[in-house]
Design a protein with these regions (language model features):
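Non-catalytic, mobile gating and regulatory segments of ester bond hydrolases
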Residues: 1-97, 101-218
Length: 218
C-alpha cells in the first residue's frame, strides 16, 4: 500500500469513540494487524495537545522515558483496549498509523508493540503523518531502537511537526521523511489533510518504489 493510500485510509476511517480523546480503529486481515489513531477531533483533543510538560512514562513501576504529558494521559487510557489485540498470538505482523494527535498515539503504540511482541520486531512498522514531538530528553541507543521501524512524515513547514519546540527538550523518534516544498504552504495549511495527501501523491510520482514499507529516508 502506498503512503498516500495509507494516509487516506487513516483520515477516512470510522473510528471507535472513547471518552478520553483516544479514538482508534483496527483491521485484522489474516494474521496482519493494523491499528489507526484519529487526528485531533474537538476542543478536548486540543487541550491535550497543549498539555506538554514532560511526564515520566512508566511500565510496572519503572520509568522508561519522558513524554508529552497530554498525549501520555490519552495513551494510558488506550492500553487496556489495545493490549489484547497486540499480544494475540494469532497476530504475526503489526502496523500502527496515526495523523496529528493520532500520530502521537502511534508513537506510544509502536513502542508498546515493540516491548510486547519481541517476536515481531523485525517487521513492526509505524507511520506518523503530521506527527508532533512526543519524547522528551535524551534516549539511550536501546531506547531509540524501539522506533527503528517508525517514520514521521512531515509536510515541510507543518507547524504541528515542529511542536513542542526542540528548544524545550522535545524530539522526534524513528526516521523523518520530508515531503513538499518550502514556502508552498503556510505552517497551518501544511498540516491540512488535503495538502499532506497532495504532497504524498507528488512524492510517490517522483519515487515510484515508495510504499508504506519502502521509501527513501531524508
Amino acid at each position: 500500500m502506498t503512503l498516500s493510500s495509507l494516509f487516506s485510509r487513516c483520515v477516512n476511517r470510522d473510528y471507535i469513540r472513547t471518552s478520553h480523546s483516544a479514538d482508534y480503529a483496527y483491521d485484522l486481515v489474516g494474521d496482519q494487524l493494523t491499528i489507526y489513531f484519529q487526528d485531533s477531533d474537538g476542543a478536548v483533543d486540543w487541550l491535550r495537545n497543549l498539555d506538554f510538560p514532560a511526564a515520566a512514562y512508566k511500565r510496572e513501576g519503572d520509568t522508561l522515558w519522558y513524554a508529552h504529558r497530554g498525549f501520555l494521559k490519552v495513551w494510558s487510557t488506550l492500553i487496556p483496549r489495545l493490549e489484547p489485540m497486540i499480544t494475540g498470538r494469532q497476530v504475526k505482523g503489526i502496523t500502527v498509523v496515526g495523523y496529528s494527535h493520532g500520530a502521537a498515539l502511534a508513537v506510544f503504540c509502536h513502542e508498546y508493540a515493540w516491548h510486547s511482541r519481541p517476536d515481531l520486531r523485525s517487521t513492526l512498522k509505524g507511520f506518523g503523518f503530521g506527527c508532533p514531538r512526543v519524547v522528551w530528553g535524551r534516549l539511550t541507543r536501546e531506547q531509540e531502537s524501539c522506533w527503528q521501524g517508525f517514520t514521521v512524515i512531515r509536510n515541510r513547514e507543518d507547524i504541528v511537526t515542529h511542536l513542542p519546540p526542540a528548544a524545550l527538550g522535545y524530539r522526534h523518534v524513528g526516521s523523518l521523511l520530508e515531503i513538499g516544498e518550502r514556502g508552498k504552504y503556510s505552517p497551518i495549511d501544511a498540516h491540512r489533510a488535503v495538502n499532506i495527501r497532495r504532497e504524498l501523491v507528488l512524492f510517490e510520482a517522483k519515487h515510484p518504489a515508495s510504499t508504506s514499507g519502502e521509501h527513501p529516508k531524508k
